[in-house]
Regions:
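Alpha/beta-hydrolase fold nucleophile elbow
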Residues: 144-154
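An N-terminal hydrophobic leader/cap segment in hydrolases
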Residues: 20, 24-65
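Short beta-strand/loop motif that positions the catalytic acidic residue
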Residues: 211, 217-223
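Membrane-embedded segments
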Residues: 71-140, 157-158, 164
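Catalytic histidine-centered segment of alpha/beta-hydrolase-like enzymes
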Residues: 251-261
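Acidic catalytic loop of the alpha/beta-hydrolase fold
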Residues: 222-226, 253-254
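Active-site nucleophile loop of the alpha/beta-hydrolase fold
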Residues: 173-183, 200-204
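Short alpha-helix in the alpha/beta-hydrolase fold that links the catalytic acid
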Residues: 99-100, 204, 213, 227-236
Length: 270
């Protein structure tokens, strides 16, 4: 008998078009992966845009020492029980509000927090750091003023609502609030797995059901940053009778504070 011969099969061949498609898909996946990595690494640079302190003087500034940072607080002292804590937007110099707030809220001591890295405050901003710093500011203010209103704007609404859920605030005002930053980021980056990449999610909806004080949600009619649906979803998570939603007509996300109704609405809520 003759031994069986094993024939060696030739490796499969692919047409030039298939090879080109393979390399194109591989390159696309590589670029997508690199984009995801870049988004993860630089996400806080997109969320936090520190601004210098352009309006304060030494008389209108206090330093609040906290673990890992010294925080600058723009202040307008006022004797009495009432105080207002302001937590601003992601690219806001909060000291710019001091003059107008002083006129609008003459019966409140004012404390406007410069986040870590903003307005001369040391340290680096993060959700955990901002929340801890807001608690520290509240505790320091509460020792002098037991009747505290908390006002948050844009990014600061997420900090403000968390603060109000953990401390005995008297009133809460949320200007251009969102349901969560994760929700906003997912809309801005629809082709990325934001849920898995984002570390600072600012999930305001988690805190809203815990709020038991009068709360005003102040929306801009033409808000180009925070969709109205996000604000409405947040409003729906409050307990019945706690929150009211007011829309200022004809203004956008960054111009809402220019409207005459802006300070009037906040003053009425206080």
């Amino acid at each position: 008998m003759h031994p069986t011969r094993f024939t060696r099969k030739a490796p499969p061949t692919f047409s030039p078009i298939v090879r080109i498609l393979f390399w194109l898909v591989s390159i696309a996946l590589l670029l997508y992966g690199l984009a995801c990595i870049a988004l993860f690494i630089f996400q806080r640079s997109l969320i936090y845009v520190p601004q210098p302190n352009a309006f304060d003087t030494s008389a209108s500034t206090r330093i609040l020492p906290v673990p890992g940072a010294d925080l600058v607080v723009s202040v307008r002292p006022h004797a009495g029980q009432k105080a207002l804590i302001y937590l601003g937007g992601n690219a806001e110099d909060v000291s710019a509000n001091l003059a107008s707030f002083s006129s609008a809220f003459p019966n409140h001591a004012l404390y406007l927090l410069h986040y870590r890295g903003y307005g001369g405050s040391s340290g680096k901003a993060s959700e955990d750091a901002l929340r801890a710093d807001a608690l520290a500011l509240f505790d320091a203010v509460y020792a002098e003023h037991p009747d505290i209103a908390i006002v948050g704007r844009s990014l600061g609404t997420g900090v403000a609502i968390g603060l109000a859920s953990q401390r005995p605030a008297a009133r809460l005002v949320l200007v251009t609030p969102y349901n969560s930053i994760q929700e906003i980021a997912a809309q801005q980056f629809p082709y990325f797995p934001v849920r898995w990449l984002l570390t600072d999610k600012f999930e305001s909806w988690r805190y809203a059901p815990k709020i038991r004080i009068p709360t005003l949600l102040l929306a801009a009619e033409f808000d180009e940053v925070i969709p109205r649906t996000s604000t409405e979803r947040l409003n729906a998570t409050f307990a019945n009778g706690i929150a009211s939603l007011v829309t200022i007509p004809g203004v956008g996300h960054n111009t809402i504070s220019n409207a005459a109704q802006y300070l009037a609405a906040i003053r009425a809520a206080l």
